[in-house]
Regions:
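Residue-level signature of alpha-solenoid helical repeat scaffolds
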Residues: 18, 59, 79, 117, ...
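Asp-box/WD-like beta-propeller blade repeats and closely related beta-sheet repeat scaffolds
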Residues: 78-108
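Inter-helical turn/loop segments and adjacent helix faces that build the functional surface
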Residues: 68, 122-135, 208-212
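Extracellular disulfide-rich cysteine clusters
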Residues: 341-441
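Active-site cradle of extracellular carbohydrate-active enzymes
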Residues: 112-119, 133-208, 228
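Acidic/His metal-coordination segments adjacent to aromatic residues that form catalytic metal sites
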Residues: 39-44, 98-101, 165-188, 233-245
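CBM-like carbohydrate-recognition segments
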Residues: 1-52, 56, 64-67, 73, ...
Length: 441
């Protein structure tokens, strides 16, 4: 075992490890062993040659530590952080910020966003790691003060790829000038507004706002999130990467990273309208991808999430595009409880089919091709309904089961009846893409 996922670059495997860790935490999955095996087969320099590469793994190990508190994961993360801090922060070009690689002084957005987020993710562990209480927080504040003044955030509240400077050894793009940095030598290069640049910053700002009690930082995050879901989309409000349909393997991961961090942002918000807007966006994208963008030949997902592209088996699909889709599904599952109407008499029990403590199922009325709204409304009208579960499957496939104590003769018209032994619902079988809702008595 190499510690890397098949057909992925090194940094991508670090990103996918965070995706897997989120999946494990969601379902208490036995795949937890993969985290340990990955750790044993990698080191702090796994992933690539640049400082952004290392930090994807840093974040993955911190997420792994939150699921399984193995101190070796935490120590690996802080070792990466210390290496990046010593070698990447550079005041001589653009007045600060971390550069892309040891031999490339380009100041790009993602490397600096990752540095902000890494420090905020490490901040709660400062004492455990033998650092001063504000050590990581101070670095995060220093990074954000530089980032905000750098000109990376353009007039549309979107973040471009990086900065241009005549003093830089090299850079990835020099596409124009917009927004001058505070030292007067660097400007926004007007590079592509990749979706992941709009995503990682959201969690960094949310954590920084929470630590400093500065709500202005949340306002920044909301402006970036709003601009993304308004501008980087197809006409059907489905997220769009600027490179589509001709994205390379790096770029195929970007949308998954955005929605993951949009989901991370939501718990820190207090504005109900924004919460509902973001939850709705995630849910709509997830339903579209799950029902129309999976290739039935190999189970892989297309890089294009909009169903305006009719070929789900196009040549763009691979491990990277599928990893992004799983980020979307996990984000949808984590935000699902907040999407239920506050007036509802139902509470989300978890992912999977509804069952009792013995693993038995209740009798149910069931029907195929039923939306969740119809499923819930029909269950509401059944006085004997105890719970319902709704499943999304292959293209066009949605399935509703109303777990009920009602007489089979009193079922809704057009629905089938299945008899089973259980008489209550207490848990789920944790099946992905299915959600169980329990009636609130």
């Amino acid at each position: 075992m190499s510690g890397l996922w098949k057909n992925e670059q090194g940094w991508q495997s670090g990103n996918t490890l965070e995706t897997l860790t989120n999946f494990v935490s969601l379902l208490d999955s036995p795949l937890k062993y993969v985290i340990h095996e990955t750790f044993m087969n990698t080191d702090m320099f796994t992933g690539g040659d640049c400082f952004d590469d290392y930090q994807w793994w840093l974040l993955a190990w911190l997420q792994a530590y939150s699921v399984e508190p193995n101190l070796r994961y935490l120590y690996r993360a802080v070792d990466i952080h210390d290496f990046v801090t010593v070698n990447a922060w550079n005041d001589s070009i653009c007045g600060g910020g971390v550069q892309l690689c040891r031999n490339n002084t380009y100041k790009n957005a993602i490397t600096n966003e990752l540095f902000l987020l890494s420090n905020m993710r490490l901040h709660p562990y400062a004492s455990l790691l033998g650092r001063a209480p504000t050590y990581f927080l101070d670095w995060a504040l220093k990074e954000w003060q530089w980032f905000e003044a750098s000109g990376l955030i353009n007039g549309d509240s979107l973040i471009n790829d990086g900065l241009s400077s005549s003093n830089q050894a090299s850079s990835k793009s020099h596409e124009g000038n917009m927004g001058r940095s505070r030292d007067g030598t660097c400007v926004n290069n007007n590079g592509t507004t990749w979706t992941y640049n709009q995503g990682v910053i959201l969690t960094g700002l949310a954590l920084l706002a929470n630590a400093t009690r500065n709500v202005t930082l949340l306002n920044f995050a909301q402006k970036i999130a709003d601009a993304t879901i308004q501008r980087l989309i197809y006409s059907d409000r489905i997220l769009k990467e600027p490179c589509e349909p001709n994205c390379n393997d790096d770029q195929k991961l970007f949308k998954g990273i955005f929605v993951r961090h949009l989901a991370y942002l939501i718990p820190y918000l207090t504005d109900a309208a924004h919460i509902q807007q973001y939850v709705s966006f995630i849910q709509q994208n997830a339903e579209t991808v799950l029902t129309s963008r999976r290739c039935e030949i190999d189970g892989l997902y297309s890089v294009i999430w909009s169903n305006q592209s009719f070929n789900s088996c196009d040549s763009s699909r691979n491990t990277s595009s599928t990893s992004a889709a799983w980020d979307l599904f996990i984000a949808a599952a984590k935000t699902k409880p907040q999407s239920i109407m506050s007036s509802s008499n139902w509470t989300w029990l978890g992912l999977g089919n509804c069952m009792d403590d013995n693993g038995a199922y209740m009798p149910n009325f069931n029907k195929i091709n039923v939306t969740e709204t119809v499923c819930r409304t029909t269950a509401e009208q059944d006085q004997g309904a105890v719970a319902y579960d709704h499943q999304l499957g292959c293209p066009g496939y949605q399935y509703c089961r109303i777990r009920t104590l009602s007489d089979p003769q009193h079922g809704p018209p057009g629905w089938s009846y299945e008899n089973n032994t259980a008489r209550n619902v207490t848990r789920t079988n944790k099946l992905p893409v299915t959600s169980c809702y329990l009636r609130v008595v």
